[in-house]
């Protein structure tokens, strides 16, 4: 059924299709009996999938990545779609329209997306109001970024303001310094710039704080950020954001689409490399959330055994449809049982621990 729906949706410009799907999901989730039925049909049921990460209980490891529900306007939908949690955002301290359209493109031959959305959102205060009214069925994380008009020199206060507004209402908070679509944002990944931002956010909230990084960092920069995260006692690292690399793309005309970040399978190999390096560096001292190019249960299992405590997806959901999260969770549960693991936690990093030193 979904392949037909996807073909029809792909006849519509991507951002319009996104809004249409959003309206349908919100409408369905607004009807409590329908929402409960969907959760019974699509939600995770095997208790082996549940885990406690940075003090938060997750019913299953695959969550909706930031960028899909930027303003938390479909908060009740994501548990019904089978996700174990959802990350809302990116939100900024001040509302902003983002970059001019067109700003979202399908790379169908690569099962990928190119976006240069530019943190379009209603602002952290509007999200805080929605979160305060919401009774979560699954954990809800919030991803915060820098307002475009805020100069880099005032980035600390900008992130602090967002953390103050949404931190107390979120299951966890992610500091996004890695989107390629806000000028100068990735420069904040340099340790000397990142340290005061993370320190300020940590001081502002008791909610677990993570940092989201780019896949395009050098290995030495990855090591520096990992060490800083441990030093500042962060809850974890989200790896990775979209890539600016165009290597290996097969979709015709991609060079004419302009700048932006690529998500989906073209990102997978680098996302795994980054995950493995981070896990080898920090071990169990930080929780690692792996995102980028996860399409199947095999992909998900590779990330878990490479060191990911949690997973996220966005592009895979668009191409995979309503059963995507369910199929991945069922595949993970099957591999846990077949491998003799008593819990998801036991499997995290198991492939790295077996490697000879």
UniProtKB/Swiss-Prot annotation:
It is found in: Cell membrane. Binds 1 FMN per subunit. Its cofactor is FMN. GO terms for molecular function: dihydroorotate dehydrogenase (quinone) activity; dihydroorotate dehydrogenase activity. The active site is at 179 (nucleophile). It comes from the Bacteria. Gene3D superfamilies: Aldolase class I. Keywords: Cell membrane, Flavoprotein, FMN, Membrane, Oxidoreductase, Pyrimidine biosynthesis. One of its GO terms (cellular component) is cytoplasm. PROSITE patterns: DHODEHASE_1 (PS00911), DHODEHASE_2 (PS00912). It is a peripheral membrane protein. Its main location: membrane. GO terms for biological process: 'de novo' pyrimidine nucleobase biosynthetic process; 'de novo' UMP biosynthetic process; pyrimidine ribonucleotide biosynthetic process. The keyword Flavoprotein applies. Its EC number is 1.3.5.2. FMN binds at residues 66-70, 90, 143, 176, 212, 240, 264, 293, 314-315. Monomer. Belongs to the dihydroorotate dehydrogenase family. Type 2 subfamily. Catalyzes the conversion of dihydroorotate to orotate with quinone as electron acceptor. HAMAP family: DHO_dh_type2 (MF_00225). This is Dihydroorotate dehydrogenase (quinone).
